[in-house]
């Protein structure tokens, strides 16, 4: 299956053939250079390189993103965080129909997957009132450049911006007490977790997977710094490992967040925890 995906992508990029050409043109001879390129990609795949890095893109939610080894590969389980954010945006609009602006902060944005998926859905739903402003933050300059490129490709540069920062360090001061939702899929894997040396994780940026401490360092930083930026009643939602839910809720309560809860994914695993700044 991976070999067909790689060939289909090459046909599309090099010959402008649709992927259906794998069937409709299966008797046609291919240029030798393309065959050599395909074999080289196959060899990399056999050595474990993720397909998303080989083809340079990955579908996520309702969008397709350009990806590279500088960023994590967007995963289906992270779509839960997007869906919960969209649900909360709708809740806020229903509770306050006169609200003119909703601000969302995406910490550790990587390729921009979460911010752009949210922005795309809200734009598709013609949410012109209230105005939606989304700011994606990442420490990696390479990730920020890629996220900006994805925003441009998706036509979302008016609504979704990206900036380099270590968590809250370089966030504009005018955002204090004005953010409605802070969302994040931070590095949460324990540095000794054997999964880091298995599968796709071997090829992904280690700093985007683990805090190199205990798996909670980045989560603590996000939660300890969220209150100055959230408005009254604003929410923070964080993806985490399914065995971390109890600890994340404890950290949320320790930082004076209320209405704390964890939400299961389709497999029943608690993968996202949410808390609200008291109003």
Model-derived regions: residue spans:
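Mobile active-site "lid"/loop adjacent to the S-adenosyl-L-methionine
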Residues: 186-218
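Conserved Class I SAM-dependent methyltransferase catalytic core
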Residues: 213-276
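Residue-level signal for inorganic ion chemistry
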Residues: 6, 10, 48, 78, ...
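Conserved beta-strand segments of alpha/beta enzyme cores
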Residues: 64, 133, 159-161, 258-261
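Active-site beta-alpha loop architecture of Rossmann-like, nucleotide-cofactor-dependent enzymes
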Residues: 52, 189, 243
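Conserved SAM/SAH cofactor-binding pocket of Class I
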Residues: 80-195
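Helix N-cap/coil-helix junction residues
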Residues: 16-17, 156, 257
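Conserved AdoMet
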Residues: 9-88
């Amino acid at each position: 299956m991976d070999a067909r995906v790689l060939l289909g992508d090459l046909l599309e990029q090099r010959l402008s053939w649709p992927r259906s050409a794998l069937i409709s043109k299966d008797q046609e001879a291919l240029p030798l250079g393309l065959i050599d390129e395909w074999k080289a990609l196959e060899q990399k795949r056999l050595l474990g390189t993720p397909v998303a890095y080989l083809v340079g893109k990955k579908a996520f939610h309702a969008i397709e993103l350009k990806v590279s080894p500088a960023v994590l590969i967007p995963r289906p389980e992270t779509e839960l965080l997007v869906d919960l954010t969209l649900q909360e945006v709708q809740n806020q609009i229903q509770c306050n129909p006169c609200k003119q602006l909703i601000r969302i902060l995406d910490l550790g944005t990587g390729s921009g997957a979460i911010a752009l998926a949210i922005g795309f859905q809200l734009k598709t739903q013609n949410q012109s009132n209230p105005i939606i402003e989304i700011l994606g933050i990442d420490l990696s300059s390479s990730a920020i450049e890629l996220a900006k490129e994805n925003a441009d490709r998706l036509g979302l540069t008016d609504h979704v911006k990206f900036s380099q920062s270590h968590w809250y360090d370089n966030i504009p001061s005018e955002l204090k007490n004005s953010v409605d939702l802070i969302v994040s899929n931070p590095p949460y894997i324990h540095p000794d977790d054997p999964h880091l040396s298995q599968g796709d994780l071997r090829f992904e940026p280690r700093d985007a997977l683990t805090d190199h401490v205990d798996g909670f360092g980045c989560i603590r930083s996000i939660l300890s710094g969220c209150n100055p930026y959230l408005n009254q009643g604003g929410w923070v939602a964080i993806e985490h490992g399914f065995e971390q839910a109890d600890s994340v809720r404890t950290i949320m309560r320790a930082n004076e967040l209320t209405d704390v809860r964890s939400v299961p994914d389709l497999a029943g695993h608690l993968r996202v925890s949410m808390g609200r700044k008291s109003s």
